[in-house]
């Protein structure tokens, strides 16, 4: 999600993308909810009734004491969790039973969230649309879309709202306390006292409206932000598969419905049903409130008591409880259809299969943790049974995104899924799955493989995340939603110790779990999916019939009312809001830049090395970058593949299984990334580099460097069968999910029309890379590819073209440098090669990547000035202003796209984009009319909108950075802390006159170097509607 471009994330059920890191059942929307005002006479439950008696704690000084009451909140439980250096406080509001979980931790990035258990009873998307409407104005802030308006009145590090399968959460985070209190007021008023205006329902949910609202004779169509969002979501096959897996393995309760909304069911939602749902499910007794960080929790308790909870009474919220799924007596098989993906593999291989098993109750914390570890042992890496038996035989494109263990639902699940396989291989997959389970149950696992999984988990506990508070919230939400013990769930070290103890006492511990949960489990779903070439046509026909059914019920009076309502909505959307009602920071609140540790530059064995001494929790982080600009064009195009497979091929001294085992036992893994970096001073040249990123516990640093040395000196590309499998999995991986990131691909496609560096970026990261890889593999033998990758490896790791960076603690720094020196001693040196290439700018052009999906992703890119040019911060402020004042109101609110915005990158490319957009040429026209709008609406650029736009930029500039990544901008771009502070100061000093000058200089006349790009369905009238020639990529 691009902050400021999209309102919410509807969380699709997908175990592999669980946040630790995200069908046509016809049920009438319930409209007979009981009014809660009649049941307020019951007394709040006691702590015993809630199953949470005061917890006995050790003698430690705490800010709040168990059993005491603070602003109406009784403190029920206090615990210190040493592994995360935090103290957990559990409060419960005595009048309503509302639980508040406060995490006190020395972390400047503070978090707040209001969570509700929202169980859908149909697929109209009611909880999802309510989430949107709640943020469209409230009693205290009767401003249309205060959420979007606060994006630029805040320096939040995160602001969003999310609808999951059975919950809705409203989280934000910020490092500024004034900002924190402002956003608390906005969010609390939004959820407890929203306006829920009917016209916001029409805008955000769905409406029947004339295609051209000013033409009474134009046909009636369905519009709406969520409606278009979900059309986009259901155009992605991976999402369709994940959603159907959830619906079919839990067929008896709320999970059988689509919480985000099925596009063909959304138009069945009535506005009154949504209002009634809010009264019941957003009651404080059904809420859970989370706060995290350094800020005073007593202020939060007082605010809740005085303004939102004291006039409420307890209600029994058992109506929202999710019961366990009744277990099946026989396994089930379900087959579904999907769209033909023209960017995917051949039609005969565009099939997917998943075998899913229902596991344990999510609230059984130790059991769920152990099943999670067991799942990793079964599927993770080349030493796991399923990888060996399902992936290495190479009859598929590898695991699909549903693979893994998930605790996102009341009952946890384990899934193994494959993508890009033939229908005739479904049977083979099932047979291999069964055989793998039986063999694992009988033979057990290699102890080192199990230990490598546990080590990786332990290392992740030490790894510091700048968004720890948000991560903790997202990891805990599902468990908390089912009344699980979220505090005990933080004691991961205890759970690991408990598991190790169980394994040591019973050598068949995991084997017995496999017998119980895998071999003898009848609650097993096999879901298969195959493409239907008529899938999109069938959806369009169903949508057309839905509209026709609704139109048949209309007489002339109702049709006239729809026309008039469309005009009223248009006026409603254009009306000016009194944003003075909203809180806003001042310049004094944000003037000081964040302080970062000093970077030291040393020449270590003739290698420029950046050193940062910083508290890293006993971890050393190492990055090294090799300039590869001198590679040939073909070799450069193969670098993304090279980066993907190099650590999976094995070395001279270790086969790939042994090497993977050593990596996981001693390090956090080796990540290879290709970087194309333009000169941020003048954008006249660029360089190409490959960066290796790894980290390890301090006591494993010698082994980390030894393994890195082994890999880059002795990697082998002689196993053609393994490489063939890795290549096919890689192509399958990059081909999946294009639509879900369609705006990013569209911006890359537009940039590729601006300059040759942009064209190369698209060939390395964009849709063009997918096409290149397919064609290259088709025309080149695997043996030849082995030879080409070996040649690349012999050229890339040149000590003369290397730079290094080490982030570690001050006390360990001498040891880290000593081990680093030994690592450098063995690296080959064969002279400096070409280190940069000149950038050439291109004539304007337009291109479309045709996709058989029902929405568009549009982009326009033009060259302006790079990061260190004096006008760059002005253009960055302008991009924020355009997003908030022009693009979002026109493209999102009025025209129905899910998201839209503008941005400028460090290379000086200024981009416009839209996301899940029902329009294409209409949106491109809006991009083109930017200058016209700016000149016609000069009054919009006032001191307040200027300051708000600066705050939007500060959200990005002042974002928290993990200890392991401090100094990354200098390492990649040679942007120093002094450069950064100068840039930040210039940005804050931008005036209205500066903006006006930038508007004239960069938008007053059409840029000499621009490009346009659309990802979306065929448009036969594209050239006619745009008056441009288009390159069409089918």
Swiss-Prot record:
Mitochondrion recorded as keyword = yes
Assembly and partners? Homodimer.
List the record's Gene Ontology CC terms alphabetically.
mitochondrial matrix
Give the family from UniProt: Belongs to the peptidase M16 family. PreP subfamily.
Q: Quote the catalytic residue positions.
A: 131
> Which cofactors does this protein require?
Zn(2+)
Q: What EC designation does it have? A: 3.4.24.-
Q: Where is the transit peptide?
A: 1-29
Could you give a single Gene Ontology term from the biological process aspect?
proteolysis
Q: Please explain the role this protein plays, according to its UniProt record.
A: ATP-independent protease that degrades mitochondrial transit peptides after their cleavage. Also degrades other unstructured peptides.
- What is this protein's record name? Presequence protease, mitochondrial
- Keywords in alphabetical order, please: Hydrolase, Metal-binding, Metalloprotease, Mitochondrion, Protease, Transit peptide, Zinc
